[in-house]
Amino acid sequence: MSLVTQILLNADDELRYPTSGELETIKSFLKTGNKRISIINNIAQNEKKIIEQASKQLWQVHPEYISPGGNAYGARQRSLCLRDYGWYLRLVTYGILAGDQRPIEKIGIIGVREMYNSLGVPVIGMVDSITALKNSTLSVLSPEDSEEVKPYFDYIIQAMAA
């Protein structure tokens, strides 16, 4: 749920207009819209590079994943891992666009640990993979934009590690 929607729902629940403070919050949020869109465009344009760098980082930390018997051994399994990278990267951009972590939680976090456990995917490997994805993404962003993006990756990492 976006910040604007949340403020409107709160005001409606209390049968009132949004307060001046809430309107200022909305105004500040809307002022950051172009910046958030620019960050998302940068990530989208660099998706392939980000995913390639992140996968190389993960395979260096966990070479056993791409060895015979590993979860990412073989072209099919490896392509599934890379598909997940793209999915998590998009999920982060949803949070950036909304300015909130709720889309990440609703779309992608609920039940993720159970899913990976049922598939035999080591959760620590997923934590490491999202960390690699975060590092790779931050490498294509400015320091200021990186600060905007970090909390969304950290949210996913913390949810998986819990």
Swiss-Prot record:
Keyword annotations? Antenna complex, Bile pigment, Chromophore, Cyanelle, Electron transport, Membrane, Methylation, Photosynthesis, Phycobilisome, Plastid, Thylakoid, Transport
Annotated compartments? Plastid, Cyanelle thylakoid membrane
Residues recorded with modification N4-methylasparagine? N71
Function statement: Allophycocyanin is a photosynthetic bile pigment-protein complex with maximum absorption at approximately 650 nanometers.
Q: Which family does it belong to?
A: Belongs to the phycobiliprotein family.
The family database entries (Gene3D superfamilies) matched by this protein are listed as: Phycocyanins
Q: What is the lineage of its organism?
A: Eukaryota, Glaucocystophyceae, Cyanophoraceae, Cyanophora
One GO CC term, this protein: cyanelle thylakoid membrane
Gene assigned in the entry? apcD
Chief localization: plastid
Look up the coiled coil feature and give its residue ranges. none
- This chain's protein is named Allophycocyanin alpha-B chain
**Positions contributing to (2R,3E)-phycocyanobilin binding:** C81
Q: Which GO terms describe its biological process?
A: photosynthesis
Q: How does it sit in the membrane?
A: Peripheral membrane protein
What processing steps or modifications follow its translation? Answer: Contains one covalently linked phycocyanobilin chromophore.
